[in-house]
């Protein structure tokens, strides 16, 4: 179905309860409902937003268009968690219900401040001429989960500096001062990151500090979803540079999600990441974008990603549902690399550990499991996951120890990552996989492997010892 602009931007109150019930019934028919990933009840899920800790709970939002598998009039759906594994909806939704966000509640972030959770997000306004004006808007949630929007924008666009591509504010605290990064396209059509600070930490009064200096390379034509976090005294910038030259970072997806590690973050005469290293892919898989990371009150760093990509269709679209979020990953730095690994509480989903010899025979699974292989004393092999009795696989993983590579094969598409492979953990959740090499040195993710009803086994070209756990939430 091709959606017109009018259909995409129908107001929420124009849909009846009967319309919503029909959408829910259709979505339930999808054969690929996940077991331990966050996905929408109906419609499209994309960017994770507002990832934070407040009032003794983890908070998370996701961008949502409830009425179809397309990018339409967006809102935010609110979730809370005690353990970063089990998330529950609170019923709170940040709706596009003011003149400043009448064309959608776009991405943003959150920060616990005093007795409330402060939200900052991009509100898209469109007038009768359909010209877009992006405003950075604010809201706050109290300890009773009551939400109030600020009546006026916090940051207005300056079209002498940027185009209307000016979005995705990330608020963070550094050395007692509150700052905000905003992804943008400069008036010269280059990707930039704008930096602001809250004057005297007044969250309604922001000063433009200029652009963040972190690379001599041209950052494509637009930067989305910038995040700055701090790990063991180092500064880590995570962002999505659209149109990035592939000579800077090799990537095969429509848009990359990358990171850079620096020694320090400074403001004043220069707003910069000092001694910033090279850009590195955050994920070497097929579909990972719009990662949001933040520092918890104890300083630890976490991230969660949208397993999907803009301007992409999926088999679930016919059920009027699309998009999932990754597992929450804890972040660390080792040997000047960013490591990402599922939070420790994920282990509590494991059911009955099995030690198996996997060979060219089918071991039946539920397509909801964790598979672990210690490759230090084992041979190279080709793993077939989500396979049937004939050996037809939805996903293959080729481990080449001699050349230190791992290759993903999905429907004749391939992704290649270079790494000395000692250990591999594979998480499968129906149509989703997340693979972690060496406890997070490399990550390869995807939400577009759609096995048929007969593809639920695993096999290996060469015999290897594995550990296998079914995962139940």
Swiss-Prot record:
Pathway as given in its UniProt record: Glycan biosynthesis; sucrose metabolism
The keyword Hydrolase is annotated on this UniProt entry: yes
SMART domains listed in its UniProt record: Glyco_32
Binding site for substrate: 44-47, 63, 106-107, 167-168, 224
EC number annotated for this UniProt entry: 3.2.1.26
Compartments where located: Cytoplasm
Domain of life: Bacteria
Any single GO BP term: sucrose metabolic process
Gene3D superfamilies assigned: Exo-inulinase, domain 1, Glycosyl hydrolase domain, family 43
Catalytic site positions: 47
pH sensitivity of activity: Optimum pH is 6.5-7.0.
Listed InterPro entries: ConA-like_dom_sf, GH32_Enzymes, Glyco_hydro_32, Glyco_hydro_32_AS, Glyco_hydro_32_C, Glyco_hydro_32_N, Glyco_hydro_beta-prop_sf, Suc6P_hydrolase
Reactions catalysed according to its record: Hydrolysis of terminal non-reducing beta-D-fructofuranoside residues in beta-D-fructofuranosides
Major subcellular location class: cytoplasm
Record's protein name: Sucrose-6-phosphate hydrolase
Organism: Lactococcus lactis subsp. lactis
Record gene name: scrB
């Amino acid at each position: 179905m091709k959606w017109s602009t009018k259909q995409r931007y129908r107001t929420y109150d124009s849909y009846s309860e009967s319309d919503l019930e029909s959408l829910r019934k259709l979505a339930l028919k999808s054969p690929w409902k996940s077991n331990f990933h966050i996905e929408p009840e109906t419609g499209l899920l994309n960017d994770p937003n507002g990832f934070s800790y407040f009032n003794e709970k983890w908070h998370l939002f996701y961008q949502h268009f409830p009425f179809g598998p397309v990018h339409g009039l967006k809102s935010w759906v609110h979730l809370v968690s005690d353990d970063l594994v089990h998330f529950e909806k609170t019923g709170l939704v940040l709706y596009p219900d003011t003149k400043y966000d009448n064309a959608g509640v776009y991405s943003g972030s959150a920060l616990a401040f005093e007795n409330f959770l402060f939200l900052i997000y991009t509100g898209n306004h469109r007038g009768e001429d359909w010209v877009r004006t992006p405003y950075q808007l604010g809201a706050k949630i109290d300890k009773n989960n009551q939400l109030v929007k600020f009546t006026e924008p916090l940051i207005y666009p300056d079209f002498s500096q940027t185009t209307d591509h000016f979005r995705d504010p990330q608020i963070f605290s550094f050395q007692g001062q509150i700052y905000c990064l905003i992804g943008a396209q400069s008036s010269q059509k280059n990707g930039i990151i704008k930096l602001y600070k809250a004057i005297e930490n007044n969250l309604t009064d922001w000063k433009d500090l200029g652009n963040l200096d972190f690379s001599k390379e041209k950052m494509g034509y637009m930067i989305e979803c910038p995040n700055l976090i701090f790990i063991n005294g180092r500064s880590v910038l995570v962002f999505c540079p659209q149109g990035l030259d592939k000579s800077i970072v090799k990537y095969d997806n429509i848009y990359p999600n990358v990171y850079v590690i620096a020694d320090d973050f400074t403001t004043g005469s220069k707003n910069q990441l000092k001694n910033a290293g090279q850009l590195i892919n955050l994920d070497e898989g097929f579909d990972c974008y719009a990662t949001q990371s933040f520092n918890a009150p104890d300083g630890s760093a976490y991230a969660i990603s949208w397993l999907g990509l803009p301007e992409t269709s999926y088999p679930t679209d016919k059920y009027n549902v699309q998009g999932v979020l990754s597992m929450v990953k804890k972040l660390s730095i080792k040997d000047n690399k960013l490591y990402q690994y599922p939070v420790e509480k994920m282990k509590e989903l494991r059911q009955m550990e099995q030690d198996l010899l996997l060979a060219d025979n089918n071991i039946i699974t539920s397509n909801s499991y964790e598979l672990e292989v210690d490759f230090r004393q084992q041979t190279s092999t080709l793993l077939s996951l989500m396979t049937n009795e004939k050996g037809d696989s939805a996903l293959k993983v080729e481990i080449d120890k001699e050349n230190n590579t791992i290759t993903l094969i999905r429907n004749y598409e391939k992704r290649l990552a270079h790494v000395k492979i000692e250990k591999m953990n594979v998480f499968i959740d129906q149509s989703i996989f997340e693979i972690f090499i060496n406890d997070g040195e490399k990550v390869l993710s995807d939400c577009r492997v759609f096995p048929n009803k007969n593809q639920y086994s695993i096999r290996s070209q060469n015999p290897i010892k594995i550990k296998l756990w079914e995962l139940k939430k």
